[in-house]
Amino acid sequence: SAQITEVAHTNHVVNPSYMALSKNGKYLYAVNENTDDKTKGMISAFAFNNKTGQMDFLNTQPTNGDAPCYVAIDSLGKNVAEANYNGANFSIYKTDTSGKLWPATQIIGHNGTSANKKIQTQSHVHSTVFSPDQKYLFVCDLGNDTLYQYPFKINNLLPVDVAGAIKYKVPAGYGPRHITFSPDQKYAYLLNELDAQLMVYRWQNDSLTYLQTLVSTAVEDTANADKGASAIRVSPDGKFVYT
């Protein structure tokens, strides 16, 4: 009948705007996107049974920034990275053997503004994405029109090398939101929220090389429409990109 049936729910989150499942399918992490107080952003950890759908609450940690909006976990399940949109920062957490989160081991702040005077009045960290080889953490900052490539050492207590960051600027007012990689790990796709632009890069030798920018024709055809883009996915065969 194609009906959806609830199999489990939890009350241990508030406004869970983004979540990530560990590669082994055993643990689920969700951010609590609180925006009323800079001290109230939280991230919650759950043990997850992928056969029954049951979620068992493990613990919660503060995100150390307002409006957490993204979370990712490395392929080994050792580090969780989350982005704080209004907090202008991102936090890194270690996990223990049960999947629980330690308090944040790194809190890394950004600054800067850009052309959109309504939205880009400060840094807005929007996503934290691990490179396919797990050697880098890519951080999209919508507020200052910058994509950051941070060297990342999975086993280090402080895995993010802040001083070693590479910065890729996008055109003023674009607002980079999410980045993802092709299944063959040869290309990266950067979705820009504010101007609905999709940028394509070659990923080779630990570096991004710009290739092209694609525009939503729906936005182009409506001169006065509000532009916006929110998520991006690549098909398993790598032939299609969806935004």
Task: Annotate the PLM regions.
Residues S1, F46-G53, Y93-W102, P151-P159, ...:
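Short loop/turn segments immediately following beta-strands, especially the blade-tip
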